[in-house]
Structures are given as structure tokens and as C-alpha cells.
């Protein structure tokens, strides 16, 4: 196994993933799905903490690890040991991208900072992910996704009005968002390198990824000092109805009428076309001014029907509506299967088939692929050291005796 394939757009690109958990490693995972050879560099004792996050497997790791660390080769290496740092530098010399998420100054303390690595490999692209970035007064503070949600403002907006702020969907949302932004940064840096021959480093902060997805929060506050509050299951600043409604069978649907035309469709779906007349609620401004009344009408209608019945009538009139899916709903959705959003991969050492999210986005000519599940700790150490650095068994055994690998 050489970790790459010539039919994918990033074939020939080698990535060192020396990060842990999700954010920076997710960037490496995305690159690996499209052909990059990803070397997962881990500490010999325990490896990446993600191996212990989530549902345990018989192999001693977790389902999270198997899914999120796909298409990677595991190489154990103690970067704090001088010999480990030396081997790491040799790998850097033969690589294109480094993904890391150590606290600022940690790699520098080990003699592996950007100033050192960029001299070894001037073409290197280095993604540095932290909670607050490499600069600024908060740079040394520890940061995780939940902290980023708080600092970036998204947690403040999640929850019922005047109630306790809640987790905005996923506790790891900021990690995935930052991994995506980091991946964009790496691809841009690769393009720049094509033009100039020079690498660069990318400074990605978790809270900034969250903050960037804040629509008009910034200009609204900058111009009018307007602070958006929690709206619960209905967000009626720009559109009404625009929220979640419970159905007769205890399930939920989302309905969004961003225009008057869409509200007219909903009114027809409810069998009450008169609601969309100009003298009632046909104008968005009127609906917004009477949002509680409009929402009550829609709420009463939804509660009189099952979810399937509500959706059937909405779909028949082209009203934007959808079920609030739990994971079981998603597995049973015919559109999900038609789009192949789920993929089954044989986990041979577990004797089972693992179902996981498929690769996105879908490229027409060079689609990504899942070629392997998250590796065992150190599974490819010897393979990589021999293949890339040309080490012999004696050299590898020496590193092992020193607990470098």
C-alpha cells in the first residue's frame, strides 16, 4: 500500500497528519479522500486521543476513529525524542503538507517550528489549527469546539428565548468547520506553490471558523448596535413561518416560507388559500408583525396531521418542508440511498461491515473514495520508514529499542 492512487486529483501529494482529534485531522481526511497519501503520525503510547472517543470496537479503538481516520497510514513517532524529531524532519523533506494542532509554541519547543521545517522543505504547506490562532492575547488558551461555539457567538443564539443557551446541533461542529476552512487553505496554498514554487503556513482558529458563518450579525451590530437573541425553534426576523412544528404523531417538520409566493403555497397546502390574500397574511411584513398568530395557525394545522400527511401536502404544493430526521430516519430515506450518502466498508479485522458517511463533494470526473478504515496504531510504521526514508530493519529496530517508534 502506498496510500495514493493516480486516478484521483490529489494523487502524488503527501500529507503528514501530526494532529489529534478532529479539526486538523479532518482536513487531512478530506485530502486523503481525493488521493493524497496521508501519514498519520502518532505518539507510540496511546496514539491519537480520537482512538478513544465514541463507541468502542473489538479492536480496541472506536467507530469514530474507524470512520474519521479513513485513508490514512499510521506511523508511530515520539516527536519529543531527538531521534523522533530527526525522523520527522526527514519525512517533512519528502512531504507536501503538514497538519498540526498543538498549542502555539509546542512544535517550536521541540525544534519543529515553521522556521525550521520551512528551511528543510521550502515547498512545505503547514496547516496550524488552534482554538484562538497563533497570535493575539488568547493564543495560549486551550480551545475545543464547545469553547469555539461560545467565543464565536453561535452558542449564544442556540436555545429558547431567554432560556439556557444549548449546544448548536453538534458538539464538534467547530472542528469540522475549521477542518473545511483548513482544507480550502491547503488547496489554495498548493495552487500558489504551483505558481511560485514556495510553500506557506495557514493559521486557522476554531472560533474564527464559527464567527465567519454569522450572516449579518456583524454589519447589523456595527451599524445599529443590534444584538440578535435566541429565537428557539422559530426564527422570524426575515421570514414567517420559518421554524419547526410538531405533528400529530409526535414528530417534527421544518417549514420555511421566505417569500410571499411560498406562503401562498403553504396556505393552499393547509386548505386555507385566503390566508395568503393581501388583506390577511399575504405580505411578509404583515406576517412578521403577527408572527405569533401565523405560527399558531401553522402549528395547529401540523398538530392535526401526521408528519407524513403534512409533508405530503407540502410537497404537493411545492412548499419548502422537510422532516427533522434522526439518524434512523436518514438511514431509511430513499433520497439518501439514491445519492449514495451512506457507504458500507468491510472491517475485516472486526468481521463486520461498517456504514459511514460517503465522500462529498461529488466530482463528475475524479470522485473521491474510501480505500481503508482508520488504521491500527503503528500499522504502517515499518512500511513508511522503508518506503519513504529507505531505512533497513536494523535502523528501525534501533528506533524501536529507544522507544522512538
UniProtKB/Swiss-Prot annotation:
A Pfam family reported for this protein in Swiss-Prot or TrEMBL: CoA_transf_3
Gene3D superfamilies per UniProt: Crotonobetainyl-coa:carnitine coa-transferase, domain 1 (3.40.50.10540), formyl-coa transferase, domain 3 (3.30.1540.10)
pH dependence: Optimum pH is 6.5.
Protein name, UniProt field: Succinyl-CoA--L-malate CoA-transferase beta subunit
GO biological process: carbon fixation by 3-hydroxypropionate cycle
Active-site residues from the entry: 175
Keyword annotations from UniProtKB, A to Z: Carbon dioxide fixation, Transferase
UniProt record similarity statement: Belongs to the CoA-transferase III family.
Gene from which this protein is expressed: smtB
EC number(s) on file: 2.8.3.22
Reactions this protein catalyses: succinyl-CoA + (S)-malate = (S)-malyl-CoA + succinate; (3S)-citramalate + succinyl-CoA = (3S)-citramalyl-CoA + succinate
Record's subunit section: Forms a large complex composed of six heterodimers (alpha, beta).
Function per UniProt: Involved in the 3-hydroxypropionate cycle used for autotrophic carbon dioxide fixation. Catalyzes the transfer of CoA moiety from succinyl-CoA to L-malate to yield L-malyl-CoA. It is highly specific for succinyl-CoA as the CoA donor, however it can accept L-citramalate instead of L-malate as the CoA acceptor.
Domain of life: Bacteria
Any one Gene Ontology molecular-function term assigned to this protein's record: succinate-citramalate CoA-transferase activity
Induction: Under autotrophic growth conditions.
Temperature dependence: Optimum temperature is 55 degrees Celsius.
InterPro entries assigned to the protein according to its UniProt record, in alphabetical order: CoA-transferase_III, CoA-Trfase_fam_III, CoA-Trfase_III_dom3_sf, CoA-Trfase_III_dom_1_sf
